[in-house]
Amino acid sequence: MGGDISRPAVANVHVLSDFRLRVEFDNGETRIFDAKPLLQGPWLGMLKNFGFFDCAFPNGRTVEWLEGQTIEPDVLYDESVAIAED
């Protein structure tokens, strides 16, 4: 089966300003993901409408939007920045 490393699943997501997501993972980590670089092309580009972007929700593994757009779990985790909890 190779060396697949399982990423934590998304437990909750909060939309922040400037197309960023505050993502809470099931391992207790909270990370900030900047989605702006991904909002290109006809499919993910639809999310440039902040009213649509604001409808992000956890789908059990990653973040999803109403039309079915998702961010690959590896990208969401690896390209996000951990934040310190109080």
Predicted regions and their residues:
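Motif-centric detector for short Cys/His coordination patterns
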Residues: M1-D86
